Amino acid sequence: GLGTNLGDKEHNLRLAVRKIEERVGKVVSLSAFYATAPWGFSSEHTFLNAAACVETLLPPLSVLHLTQEIEREIGRTHKSVGGVYSDRVIDIDLLLYGDRVLDTPELKLPHPLMHERRFVMEPLAEIAPDLVHPILKKKMRELL
């Protein structure tokens, strides 16, 4: 899942996708870009969100570290602090990794809040409507 609400938002998303393709793996599908209101905080800046499906041979934690590196390169300064969200140039979240379930301090798969966030589920359901959530056992389109 990708999101941005600062700067040239479309450019930020396209740059993130290009860097993901260069370092993580082949982007096999990319959703449309969705304009959405901020979630979890107030801002005058609307978000642009998208979902991408990437084929990779890398393990989940390597994907996480590479996407965090890409965020920093594009201009992300920090993730939420103490659960407080803020404006960001780019946010890249690893939502799913096949049907893998992972619960570590650094990474939880599937993303524990994805099904509660329409700005995540709408683009994800566009590119993978019949993909089944490995814990909830429902298709992405059913979770919308």
Residue ranges and their predicted role:
Residues 2, 30, 50-52, 92-94:
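A structural signal for short, well-ordered beta-strand segments
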Residues 4, 52-58, 96-98:
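Short beta-strand-to-loop capping motifs
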Residues 39-46, 61-144:
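Flexible, gly/pro- and Lys/Arg-enriched active-site loops
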Residues 1-24, 31-37:
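N-terminal beta1-alpha1 ligand-phosphate binding loop
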Residues 6-9, 13, 23, 41, ...:
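Hydrophobic alpha-helical segments and helix-packing faces
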Residues 28-30, 105:
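Beta-strand scaffold of nucleotide-dependent catalytic cores
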